[in-house]
Amino acid sequence: MDQSLANGVGGASIERNTTETRIRVAVNLDGTGVYDVKTGVGFLDHMLEQLSRHSLMDLSVAAEGDVHIDAHHTTEHSGIAIGQAVAKAVGDRKGIQRYGHAYVPMDETLTRVALDFSNRPYLIWKVSFSRDKIGDMDTELFREWFQAFAMAAGVTLHVECLYGENNHHIVESCYKALARALRAGIEIDPRKRDAVPSTKGTLGGSL
């Protein structure tokens, strides 16, 4: 998947090994939403599958982590690796729309996500839960994943659940809204295919 595609952004792969996790990620940003996700954390797999399906990003994740302790390292490190792969795939960010946003309803829940491929990573997270766990995951870990993804991908990311009651619906709408915003942000602008979407001629400063 580590290739540049003629009509879009392209693909990339990342391998990230630490004493806590071993993770291999491949993405194709010009895909159709095909996924193969195995993190060892069932609910995280479910969320990453939603990310792939609704962004149309093909996503392969193979992770081995210290889940006998808890899911923290696998969750955070998968966010880092996916973010790194996305950043590698978009490269110098020439031709992309850069900005993306989405509102996603899920029954009683409504979530808004806005992002900027600014190369100035930042996360605003306005999401709260009424339970400590969803499935096999601590709810506090979802912020860790979004933080890790934003930092590694080099995106400014705002995630806000406007209202909702069901905790599963809340977090799933966050991933689906991220997916739709990501899809919009990486879309190629045919009028500016060879231009970086910034008056500076480059994006970022800290990365």
UniProtKB/Swiss-Prot annotation:
**InterPro entries xref list:** IGPD_sf, ImidazoleglycerolP_deHydtase, ImidazoleglycerP_deHydtase_CS, Ribosomal_Su5_D2-typ_SF
Give the intrachain disulfide bonds. Answer: none
Which Pfam family is one of this chain's hits? IGPD
Record localization: Cytoplasm
Metabolic or biological pathway, per its Swiss-Prot or TrEMBL entry: Amino-acid biosynthesis; L-histidine biosynthesis; L-histidine from 5-phospho-alpha-D-ribose 1-diphosphate: step 6/9
Primary localization: cytoplasm
Q: What is its EC class?
A: lyase
Q: Name one GO molecular function term.
A: imidazoleglycerol-phosphate dehydratase activity
Spell out the reaction equation it catalyses. Answer: D-erythro-1-(imidazol-4-yl)glycerol 3-phosphate = 3-(imidazol-4-yl)-2-oxopropyl phosphate + H2O
> Which GO BP terms sit in this record?
L-histidine biosynthetic process
UniProtKB keywords: Amino-acid biosynthesis, Cytoplasm, Histidine biosynthesis, Lyase
What Enzyme Commission number(s) apply to this enzyme? 4.2.1.19
State any GO CC term: cytoplasm
Family of this protein: Belongs to the imidazoleglycerol-phosphate dehydratase family.
Q: What is this protein called?
A: Imidazoleglycerol-phosphate dehydratase
Q: Which organism is it from?
A: Azospirillum brasilense
